[in-house]
Curated annotation (Swiss-Prot):
CDD domains: TFP_snake_toxin. Expressed by the venom gland. Keywords: Acetylcholine receptor inhibiting toxin, Disulfide bond, Ion channel impairing toxin, Neurotoxin, Postsynaptic neurotoxin, Secreted, Signal, Toxin. This is Short neurotoxin 1. InterPro entries: Snake_3FTx (IPR003571), Snake_toxin-like_sf (IPR045860), Snake_toxin_con_site (IPR018354), Toxin_cobra-type (IPR054131). Residues 1-21 form the signal peptide. Binds to muscle nicotinic acetylcholine receptor (nAChR) and inhibit acetylcholine from binding to the receptor, thereby impairing neuromuscular transmission. It comes from the Eukaryota. Belongs to the three-finger toxin family. Short-chain subfamily. Type I alpha-neurotoxin sub-subfamily. It comes from Hydrophis hardwickii (Hardwick's spine-bellied seasnake).
Length: 81
């Protein structure tokens, strides 16, 4: 009985993947794609315009933004590319 219980605990941990991290893109504007592993469960992409043109920032989480900045948050790996 103890063996069965231990087996169920191990299977549960493997299935839940308790150490899971999200993979988000983190390159800026038109730079080559780069990624990072994040503890957060979402990725973001912020877009705005300034004197240099359209700017894009990508990263982990879902931050609050100022008016005039477009924010897209998503919940799958590399969804903010």
């Amino acid at each position: 009985m103890k063996t069965l219980l231990l087996t169920l605990v191990v299977v549960t941990i493997v299935c839940l993947d308790l150490g899971y991290t999200m993979t988000c893109c983190n390159q800026q504007s038109s730079q080559p794609k780069t990624t990072t592993n994040c503890a957060e469960s979402s990725c973001y992409k912020k877009t705005w315009s300034d004197h240099r043109g359209t700017r894009i920032e990508r990263g982990c989480g879902c931050p609050q933004v100022k008016p005039g900045i477009k924010l897209e948050c998503c919940h799958t790996n590399e969804c903010n590319n």
